[in-house]
Amino acid sequence: MSPLHFSFYSAFTFSSLGLAFHRTHLISALLCLESMMLSMFIPLSIWPVENQTPSFALVPILMLAFSACEAGTGLAMLVASARTHGSDHLHNLNLLQC
């Protein structure tokens, strides 16, 4: 495994561990999700160049568009929860409470 691939795998692993262990605030969970998306975006954008397959060149752009939609939805949830509950703690966002 090359050092470049190892760095991408470790970035994804560390951001998923951050999502698993630092789940106190919604903004920290959103940052971990965004770092996971970026750690997947960079190898996906390098892969068509290495393999010289231009048909897969649009896949990273599509993933980046979905990532932007996810970030916008997450920030809208952050603002809505801060307005209704007064904080962005994840333990306040229990769906079983009405």
From Swiss-Prot:
A GO molecular-function descriptor: NADH dehydrogenase (ubiquinone) activity
UniProt feature coiled coil, ranges: none
Keyword presence, Zinc: no
Reactions catalysed: a ubiquinone + NADH + 5 H(+)(in) = a ubiquinol + NAD(+) + 4 H(+)(out)
Membrane topology of this protein: Multi-pass membrane protein
Subcellular locations according to the entry: Mitochondrion inner membrane
Disulfide bridges in this chain: none
Keyword field: Electron transport, Membrane, Mitochondrion, Mitochondrion inner membrane, NAD, Respiratory chain, Translocase, Transmembrane, Transmembrane helix, Transport, Ubiquinone
Tree of life domain: Eukaryota
EC number from the UniProt entry: 7.1.1.2
Keyword Ion transport applies: no
Predominant location: mitochondrion
Any one Pfam family match given in the protein's UniProt record, by short name: Oxidored_q2
A GO cellular-component term linked to this record: mitochondrial inner membrane
Transmembrane parts of this sequence: 1-21, 26-46, 56-76
GO biological process, one term: ATP synthesis coupled electron transport
Family membership noted in the UniProt record: Belongs to the complex I subunit 4L family.
Subunit structure: Core subunit of respiratory chain NADH dehydrogenase (Complex I) which is composed of 45 different subunits.
Function summary: Core subunit of the mitochondrial membrane respiratory chain NADH dehydrogenase (Complex I) which catalyzes electron transfer from NADH through the respiratory chain, using ubiquinone as an electron acceptor. Part of the enzyme membrane arm which is embedded in the lipid bilayer and involved in proton translocation.
This protein's name: NADH-ubiquinone oxidoreductase chain 4L
Species whose genome carries this gene: Gallus gallus
Classification lineage: Eukaryota, Metazoa, Chordata, Craniata, Vertebrata
